[in-house]
Amino acid sequence: MRIPEAVIFDMDGVLIDSEPIHIGIEKQLFDKLGIDVSATVHRSYMGASNEFMYSDLRSRFKLSESVSELIESDELFRSDYFHRLDTIPANDGLISLLGQIKTAGLKLAVATSSSPEIANLLLNKCGIASFFDAIVTTSEAGKSKPSPDVYLLAAQRIGVLPEDCIVFEDSPNGLSAAKSAGMFCVVIQSDNEIIKELSGADYLIQSFTEITLTRLTDLFAINQIVD
């Protein structure tokens, strides 16, 4: 029976329940820019990088600021906000699952669209940074999700073949990235409005409390047989 060698996690909305915070921050930033971004358009940026989001917004709303200026303003605002937080809670059941994975000797990585500074800040404030063998961002990979680049780079960094990785995601962009990388993908369904866009997931859960490493390994093995 083939078993997984690594588990790679998206960060926002998966490891940490930070998506509502990011959405609130972005709404404040959009207000400062004087633009009215619909919920549908805003939702389409889930899992994507700031470069992707601001390139689209600049084109859509004919903004005068350059993409680099928009990103710089965004990252300063986010960094200031998160620095003022004492701690950030991990999602329910996460610490137990990370412990199981670590004890079993599997590699662990993060593949996120957040900037390196924000990613390290949040993971440290959440108290889980030490679990991971690699933290990889889309800015390092060169392309935003739904491109598979960040997942392929994460697998390379931890020395594991893509097909031997399990991914945890929560967005359509992230799911597309993981599947395009040839990885088994479990999706945490946190937004009922995008459930149809998550139909390509190998497995759906509501919370980490529903899953164990043993169950993950079984699902991975069954998927290999079916494929």
For each of these PLM feature ranges, what is it?
Residues 35-37, 63, 128, 159-160:
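Helix N-cap/coil-helix junction residues
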Residues 22, 26-30, 50-57, 71-82, ...:
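Hydrophobic alpha-helical core bundles mediating ligand binding, dimerization, or RNAP-core interactions
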Residues 1-43, 193:
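Active-site neighborhood of HAD-like aspartate-dependent phosphohydrolases
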Residues 29-61, 67:
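Alpha-helical substrate-recognition element adjacent to the catalytic core
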Residues 1-6, 99-102, 115-227:
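Asp-based, Mg2+/Mn2+-dependent phosphohydrolase catalytic module
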Residues 36, 107, 184:
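Residue-level detector of anion-binding/catalytic polar loops
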Residues 58-96, 104:
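Metal-dependent phosphoesterase signature
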